[in-house]
Amino acid sequence: MAHVRGLQLPGCLALAALCSLVHSQHVFLAPQQARSLLQRVRRANTFLEEVRKGNLERECVEETCSYEEAFEALESSTATDVFWAKYTACETARTPRDKLAACLEGNCAEGLGTNYRGHVNITRSGIECQLWRSRYPHKPEINSTTHPGADLQENFCRNPDSSTTGPWCYTTDPTVRRQECSIPVCGQDQVTVAMTPRSEGSSVNLSPPLEQCVPDRGQQYQGRLAVTTHGLPCLAWASAQAKALSKHQDFNSAVQLVENFCRNPDGDEEGVWCYVAGKPGDFGYCDLNYCEEAVEEETGDGLDEDSDRAIEGRTATSEYQTFFNPRTFGSGEADCGLRPLFEKKSLEDKTERELLESYIDGRIVEGSDAEIGMSPWQVMLFRKSPQELLCGASLISDRWVLTAAHCLLYPPWDKNFTENDLLVRIGKHSRTRYERNIEKISMLEKIYIHPRYNWRENLDRDIALMKLKKPVAFSDYIHPVCLPDRETAASLLQAGYKGRVTGWGNLKETWTANVGKGQPSVLQVVNLPIVERPVCKDSTRIRITDNMFCAGYKPDEGKRGDACEGDSGGPFVMKSPFNNRWYQMGIVSWGEGCDRDGKYGFYTHVFRLKKWIQKVIDQFGE
């Protein structure tokens, strides 16, 4: 500015002070007089402006200002940092004044566009931007912690790293990590980059077009589709190979197995399928648009009075029917879900009553330490080199482990692990300590990822099986969980009923290194209520399918809890009041942040995919 900043005496004030000094008998001024002389005085543009707080428009818009002058006007370090980032970006636009004002407002881009603070959230090709706070589908290396002054709000386009292409964002398309946005240029009739919409079919399909759907998972389908989703031709049902494979299968005789057309004779929740040429037992699913039918809507409205009595301790017996072939599945199913240190000793753990009572009343953040032996089916998926915890998983027999597909394969995070990259640690309680004589370390023989796992869009069918090289011995700390049948899924998967999530994931959402209080020392447990499907769908822009459900507390419920990074792949379990067994209803899949208001954790619906589990185990279990 034109004048010198510092201590100044305006004309009349200086004259008065001089007169006081001349006529005074004292050399030094009284404290009150001294303070009045040393008070900083601003140049007046209007009458009495000396006594106002700093005026940002006068200081920095009408004339050039320094950081200190901006701070004096704003009186806040945070506000000054945000303003200064925009101001330095707009400095080249000092004239005309209206251009600088527009630049500071942030609704247009100046230079590299680091000043932009508008609400555009679509990239130049029409892809919706990913939330800056989210790690899905991409893990951002730039966030509000690394760039606190960049105003990384919601999913608005910004330029925190001074990219030469202007404001940009991470995208919701897993195949496109980041892309620039088309932003108006300050003072010009143009944009930073031109819009170039992608051709149809290449963008993320957040709202697929409606078309006639096939009901009942295709069990009544009579069409002529005869090719799998991978383009393989179906074998004729009357062929020798297909007949041999179906000989011991429990097929519905009402389903007509005509020629080589895709059919659903075994009630597979995945829909129609067929055998294909290749290894004995090879099969493939066929691509149809199925009507969404929630399991809980198909067979009932939850538990009845009998279950209330069971919860109250009067009756709790129900014969357990095994589902898998022990020759391929291994041992453990007949005894599944009955924990050696609890049910087998007629003991309850400290929080299971909360789950059972919820059936009557209708990443673990805010969780607590699990009791030893509380979750004996919990498995730690461990990377060999560098050694690190990758995910959770669950033991379903002495040979098979269940986890989320994205723990093994997720290209946006450079994940594509093989059996040689990983091992599993079973029976653990401590996150880091080797628990001698308690935990078992097992190598993997083979990984099987669901063939229709959709990492490109929404993690649909986020499920994988891992076969152990050698069967693991059961103990007080190692025991398999049950997988639900239709009746169990229909009765327990009700909105408001609580399930349990366990894991060694982060205790809170953080962008900093996972050290100290950010990670637990022992296995964590949290009980979470299942949420109504419409609420789940309304909580996110991501397309939700009937292979998913969500759980968590609503903002007005007064309780908190969620799975967090590191809990992925772990089990969501519920205890049946009918037979006192624990069932794995879900697999920790994805969420937008950890324990955020209005956001919920999403889980793979295990029962929906149980027939796929059976087919894989029957084919590769020997």
Curated annotation (Swiss-Prot):
Residue ranges constituting the Peptidase S1 domain according to the UniProt record: 364-618
Residue positions the entry lists as glycosylated = N121, N143, N416
The question of whether Signal is a record keyword is answered with yes
Cysteine disulfide partners in this protein: C60-C65, C90-C103, C108-C186, C129-C169, C157-C181, C213-C291, C234-C274, C262-C286, C336-C482, C391-C407, C536-C550, C564-C594
One GO biological process term: positive regulation of phosphatidylinositol 3-kinase/protein kinase B signal transduction
- Gene Ontology terms for molecular function: calcium ion binding; growth factor activity; heparin binding; lipopolysaccharide binding; receptor ligand activity; serine-type endopeptidase activity; signaling receptor binding; thrombospondin receptor activity
Q: In which tissues is it expressed?
A: Expressed by the liver and secreted in plasma.
Q: Which UniProt keywords apply?
A: Acute phase, Blood coagulation, Calcium, Cleavage on pair of basic residues, Disease variant, Disulfide bond, Gamma-carboxyglutamic acid, Glycoprotein, Hemostasis, Hydrolase, Kringle, Pharmaceutical, Protease, Repeat, Secreted, Serine protease, Signal, Thrombophilia, Zymogen
Region spans: High affinity receptor-binding region which is also known as the TP508 peptide: 551-573
Provide the effect of R314C.
In FA2D; Barcelona/Madrid
Q: How is it modified after translation?
A: The gamma-carboxyglutamyl residues, which bind calcium ions, result from the carboxylation of glutamyl residues by a microsomal enzyme, the vitamin K-dependent carboxylase. The modified residues are necessary for the calcium-dependent interaction with a negatively charged phospholipid surface, which is essential for the conversion of prothrombin to thrombin.
**Pfam families per record:** Gla, Kringle, Thrombin_light, Trypsin
Kindly state which reaction or reactions the protein catalyses. Answer: Selective cleavage of Arg-|-Gly bonds in fibrinogen to form fibrin and release fibrinopeptides A and B
Effect on the protein upon substituting S568A: Loss of catalytic activity; no effect on cleavage at R-198 by factor Xa
Instruction: Tell me which residues bear 4-carboxyglutamate.
Output: E49, E50, E57, E59, E62, E63, E68, E69, E72, E75
Q: What's the reported outcome of changing M380T?
A: In FA2D; Himi-1
Signal peptide interval = 1-24
- InterPro entries, per the entry: GLA-like_dom_SF, GLA_domain, Kringle, Kringle-like, Kringle_CS, Kringle_sf, Peptidase_S1_PA, Peptidase_S1_PA_chymotrypsin
Q: Where is the active site?
A: H406, D462, S568
Role:
Thrombin, which cleaves bonds after Arg and Lys, converts fibrinogen to fibrin and activates factors V, VII, VIII, XIII, and, in complex with thrombomodulin, protein C. Functions in blood homeostasis, inflammation and wound healing. Activates coagulation factor XI (F11); activation is promoted by the contact with negatively charged surfaces. Triggers the production of pro-inflammatory cytokines, such as MCP-1/CCL2 and IL8/CXCL8, in endothelial cells.
Q: Which family does it belong to?
A: Belongs to the peptidase S1 family.
**Annotated PANTHER family:** PROTHROMBIN
Quaternary organization: Heterodimer (named alpha-thrombin) of a light and a heavy chain; disulfide-linked. Forms a heterodimer with SERPINA5. In plasma, interacts (via N-terminus) with alpha-1-microglobulin with molar ratio 1:2 and 1:1; this interaction does not prevent the activation of prothrombin to thrombin. Interacts (thrombin) with iripin-8, a serine protease inhibitor from Ixodes ricinus saliva. Interacts (thrombin) with iripin-3, a serine protease inhibitor from Ixodes ricinus saliva.
Q: What is this protein called?
A: Prothrombin
